[in-house]
Amino acid sequence: MKVIKTAPLIPSEIKVLEKEGNRIKISLAPFEFGYAVTLAHPIRRLLLLSSVGYAPVGLKIEGVHHEFDSLRGVTEDVSLFIMNLKNIRFIAKALVGQDSPLENQSVVVDYSFKGPMELRARDLNSEHIEIINPEMLLATINEDAQLNFSLIIYKGMGYVPSEITRELMPEGYMPLDGSFTPIKNVVYEIENVLVEGDPNYEKIIFDIETDGQIDPYKAFLSAVKVMSKQLGVFGEKPIANTEYSGDYAQRDDAKDLSAKIESMNLSARCFNCLDKIGIKYVGELVLMSEEELKGVKNMGKKSYDEIAEKLNDLGYPVGTELSLEQRESLKKRLEKLEDKGGND
């Protein structure tokens, strides 16, 4: 029996069709006619643009002043060395799990190699660095030659040109383009599926391949999460502070964030925990990520849950995503409070 719908069908099926190495095929169904491509295209774009990876963005080689120099005792010149370096895929172990979108996250590693040897990517493995493609050739070092160099590896997403990374480099480092995306390829297909005898429903099949820095299924889930957060601003219950316009510091609810933590009526244990690390204002808590808050010394589960509940009551759940303008405006407001000794 045909019915006139008043709401679209909600997809209920997600299946892993194939999984081999760093490649996966996933199907999602059923979608109303026209919905599949509407969702599949932005998810594909977000996989390519928002997936987080690692890349070298700074290089310092002993005795080298610019990328057109030659390397004494090394077959490859500096340009070829850099090209080979960019083809190596890294994981910076110290940065795994750290998610602070507005702070630079990097690690510096130093290397020294003596010839004769074929320097391959696997030789760069260390307590700080894991190499995904270990057999890549980096350089050929001749007998009696030595190659000393340092790398700055950043965590990031997308592509960042050297004009930008140049501003992050200490003296003596050559800036490199940063190609962070761990996604090698992502395509999708739309197929028709039968639902209760009706063929006018659709299925999305994603084919995702990564370079090994991230599991493809995790990359997919991460992209969906990003999409959900981006769309959250339009929901019936918008995420906190979405009505931002102009100077955030002038908004009425910004006053809540400049209140001292005493106003939250926290237990003595919670208050002491925050006081010991210098947290004075509610806004400082809002600026902290979930990981940062949980990582506070002596912050047990009960204390964390208490703080999370209080922040939620204020309309700022732990991990609330503020825009760059909001964060900067809030930071400036808090700095002014510090300068005034807490009197606003």
From Swiss-Prot:
Source species taxonomy: Bacteria, Pseudomonadati, Campylobacterota, Epsilonproteobacteria, Campylobacterales
Pfam families: RNA_pol_A_bac, RNA_pol_A_CTD, RNA_pol_L
Organism field: Helicobacter acinonychis (strain Sheeba)
Region of interest: Alpha N-terminal domain (alpha-NTD): 1-238
Domain notes: The N-terminal domain is essential for RNAP assembly and basal transcription, whereas the C-terminal domain is involved in interaction with transcriptional regulators and with upstream promoter elements.
UniProt cross-references to NCBIfam families, sorted A to Z: PRK05182.2-3, rpoA
The enzyme's E.C. designation: 2.7.7.6
GO cellular component: cytoplasm; DNA-directed RNA polymerase complex
Name the record gives this protein: DNA-directed RNA polymerase subunit alpha
HAMAP family: RNApol_bact_RpoA
Highest taxon listed in the record's lineage: Bacteria
SUPFAM superfamilies: C-terminal domain of RNA polymerase alpha subunit (SSF47789), Insert subdomain of RNA polymerase alpha subunit (SSF56553), RBP11-like subunits of RNA polymerase (SSF55257)
Function statement: DNA-dependent RNA polymerase catalyzes the transcription of DNA into RNA using the four ribonucleoside triphosphates as substrates.
Binding partners and assembly: Homodimer. The RNAP catalytic core consists of 2 alpha, 1 beta, 1 beta' and 1 omega subunit. When a sigma factor is associated with the core the holoenzyme is formed, which can initiate transcription.
The protein's enzyme class: transferase
The keyword Magnesium belongs to this UniProt entry's keyword annotation: no
Family of this protein: Belongs to the RNA polymerase alpha chain family.
Renumbered residue ranges of the record's region Alpha C-terminal domain (alpha-CTD): 253-344
GO MF entry, a single one: DNA binding
InterPro entries given in the database record: DNA-dir_RNA_pol_insert, DNA-dir_RNA_pol_RpoA/D/Rpb3, DNA-dir_RpoA, RBP11-like, RNAP_asu_C, RNApol_insert_sf
Keywords in alphabetical order: DNA-directed RNA polymerase, Nucleotidyltransferase, Transcription, Transferase
